[in-house]
Each structure stands twice: as structure tokens, then as C-alpha cells.
């Protein structure tokens, strides 16, 4: 029976350290500030943004939410980002994704000044991460790495299998574990025999958005399973892993909700504090 990794608890203890850091910066007359831009009325995005605001307030950080209507022009958004780039009181800029179809996501990410890119999506941040240079790391991958380390799971020399290749989680999380000397395999929708791959994993990270994709027979006994999926099925949140069955095989597993999610926001706060220094 697996140990269920309590992401809320790990996040909470990390946030206490961040709170002390904010207090120390305030003594130096620095008030860390995160500005979030939300376009449109997407319910999931609204909920994420509320979570970010609440977490920022809890540690004493300033958080500013700019709401824009769905029909906002791309040029207007880019102009706003330009203004925030030039505003010395703003340390972190986050544009909540996904964006309306008429706005080019890449253009928007590229427009954010790299020194304020607290999401870690700018090509400068991604490039630095690739070569192992200090930079803003993407929040969910960094949260996963922190969780695994916090549970004292050895990483160097272990086989990490990542299911999913998104720019936000899949690709970067593999790179972070590679930088920690793990052997990393990527799987995706075109992988021929997914189960044959996942059964080799000492650490299995699943981030595809397909409910219960990973079943117990696809998991190596005593593996550590990190479920990044968030899917709504019959009004309930479930991950990409068949939790109850896999729990019987794995040594550790993250639940959904309450696993990776709280760490994502915590790493966003961490990045904003680093940007303020």
C-alpha cells in the first residue's frame, strides 16, 4: 500500500519559509508584487487565479489581478504587458492560459520581460533551464521535483518515465530530472506500447489529461507515481492514474486533488520572491 504524498502539507511548510522571506524583503523596503492578467470568463482559470491571489496574500505578497474581456485585442494585451514590464513595482507578470483563440500565445509569452517571467515559459528561461543555468523554472515541474525530493526519493541514476510532452509540464519536467542525473524516457500519444514503457519507471510522472489512463498493471511494484492530470468526471476531480488500484502497487503516489496542485502555486510565489530580490 503506497504512501499518499500530501502536497498540501509540503506546500504549507514551504510557504512558511516564503512568508519569512517576504518579511525580510519588507525590512529592506522591497514589497514583492505579482500581477496576473485574466482574459475572459473561463471558470477553471477564474478558480486558479483565486487560488494564486489567496496564496499570495497569506505570505504577505502583493497580488494584482487585471481582468480583461474575452474580445480584448492582441495589440491591447501586448501594450499592457509592455507597461507592466516598465513598472518597477511589479516583479512578476503572469498571463493566465489558455488565451482566446484570436490571441497568439507565443507572442504574449515572448512579450513578458525574462526577469519578470515567473511562469518560466519565456524562451530565455527555457534555454537556461536546458543548460542547467539558474533561472525561473516552470512552476508545476519544479513543484514535482520539490515534492519528490521532500519525500527523500533518490533521483540520480533512477529511471524517470514522463507520459506527456506539453511545453508546460511534460517536456520541462523531464529536463529537470535529467539535470538531477536521472535517466529520462518520454512517452506520448504515438508511443507504441505505453505499458511496456511505464512498467520500467522507478518514478512515473503522468501529465496528459486522460482520466484513469494509467492502470495498476502499467506500474512497476514500489514505483513512485506522480499524477499531474486534472480531469472532471461525474462532477468529481480525478487524475490520469487509477488511484485506488495503483495505490496497491506503488510505494508512493500523489492524489488528485491535493497532490501536485498546491506545489504549483507555491513555486509561483517562490519565483516572484526571487524576481523581487
Curated annotation (Swiss-Prot):
GO biological process: L-histidine biosynthetic process; methionine biosynthetic process; purine nucleotide biosynthetic process; tetrahydrofolate interconversion
CDD domains tied to this protein: NAD_bind_m-THF_DH_Cyclohyd
Binding site for NADP(+): 164-166, 189, 230
Key word Secreted present: no
Pfam family, any one: THF_DHG_CYH_C
InterPro entries found in the cross-reference section: Aminoacid_DH-like_N_sf (IPR046346), NAD(P)-bd_dom_sf (IPR036291), THF_DH/CycHdrlase (IPR000672), THF_DH/CycHdrlase_cat_dom (IPR020630), THF_DH/CycHdrlase_CS (IPR020867), THF_DH/CycHdrlase_NAD-bd_dom (IPR020631)
Pathway it works in: One-carbon metabolism; tetrahydrofolate interconversion
Any one GO CC term of the record: cytosol
Keywords: Amino-acid biosynthesis, Histidine biosynthesis, Hydrolase, Methionine biosynthesis, Multifunctional enzyme, NADP, One-carbon metabolism, Oxidoreductase, Purine biosynthesis
Residue spans crossing the bilayer: none
A molecular-function term among this protein's GO annotations: methylenetetrahydrofolate dehydrogenase (NADP+) activity
Catalytic activity entry: (6R)-5,10-methylene-5,6,7,8-tetrahydrofolate + NADP(+) = (6R)-5,10-methenyltetrahydrofolate + NADPH; (6R)-5,10-methenyltetrahydrofolate + H2O = (6R)-10-formyltetrahydrofolate + H(+)
Gene3D superfamilies reported in the protein's UniProt record: Leucine Dehydrogenase, chain A, domain 1, NAD(P)-binding Rossmann-like Domain
Annotated EC: 1.5.1.5, 3.5.4.9
Subunit organization: Homodimer.
The family this protein is said to belong to: Belongs to the tetrahydrofolate dehydrogenase/cyclohydrolase family.
HAMAP family from the UniProt entry: THF_DHG_CYH (MF_01576)
Matches recorded under NCBIfam families: PRK10792.1, PRK14186.1
Role, per record: Catalyzes the oxidation of 5,10-methylenetetrahydrofolate to 5,10-methenyltetrahydrofolate and then the hydrolysis of 5,10-methenyltetrahydrofolate to 10-formyltetrahydrofolate.
Protein name: Bifunctional protein FolD
Organism name: Exiguobacterium sibiricum (strain DSM 17290 / CCUG 55495 / CIP 109462 / JCM 13490 / 255-15)
Amino acid at each position: 500500500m503506497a504512501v499518499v504524498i500530501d502536497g498540501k502539507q509540503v506546500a504549507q511548510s514551504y510557504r512558511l519559509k516564503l512568508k519569512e522571506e517576504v518579511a525580510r524583503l519588507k525590512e529592506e523596503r522591497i514589497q514583492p508584487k505579482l500581477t496576473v492578467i485574466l482574459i475572459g470568463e473561463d471558470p477553471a482559470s477564474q478558480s486558479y487565479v483565486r487560488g494564486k491571489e489567496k496564496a499570495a496574500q497569506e505570505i504577505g505578497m502583493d497580488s494584482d489581478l487585471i481582468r480583461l474581456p474575452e474580445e480584448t485585442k492582441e495589440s491591447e494585451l501586448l501594450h499592457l504587458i509592455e507597461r507592466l514590464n516598465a513598472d518597477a513595482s511589479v516583479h512578476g507578470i503572469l498571463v493566465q492560459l489558455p488565451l482566446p483563440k484570436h490571441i497568439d500565445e507565443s507572442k504574449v509569452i515572448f512579450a513578458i520581460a525574462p526577469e519578470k517571467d515567473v511562469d518560466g515559459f519565456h524562451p530565455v528561461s527555457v534555454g537556461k533551464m536546458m543548460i542547467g543555468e539558474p533561472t525561473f523554472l516552470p512552476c508545476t515541474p519544479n513543484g514535482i521535483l520539490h515534492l519528490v525530493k521532500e519525500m527523500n526519493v533518490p533521483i540520480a541514476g533512477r529511471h524517470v518515465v514522463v507520459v506527456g510532452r506539453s511545453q508546460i509540464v511534460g517536456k520541462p519536467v523531464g529536463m529537470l530530472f535529467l539535470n538531477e542525473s536521472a535517466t529520462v524516457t518520454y512517452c506520448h500519444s504515438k508511443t507504441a506500447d505505453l505499458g511496456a514503457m511505464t512498467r520500467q519507471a522507478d518514478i512515473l510522472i503522468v501529465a496528459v489529461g486522460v482520466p484513469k489512463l494509467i492502470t495498476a498493471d502499467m506500474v512497476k511494484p514500489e514505483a513512485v507515481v506522480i499524477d499531474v492530470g486534472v480531469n472532471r468526471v461525474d462532477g468529481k476531480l480525478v487524475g490520469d492514474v487509477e488511484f485506488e488500484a495503483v495505490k496497491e502497487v506503488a510505494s508512493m503516489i500523489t492524489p488528485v486533488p491535493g497532490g501536485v496542485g498546491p506545489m504549483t502555486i507555491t513555486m509561483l510565489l517562490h519565483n516572484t520572491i526571487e524576481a523581487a530580490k
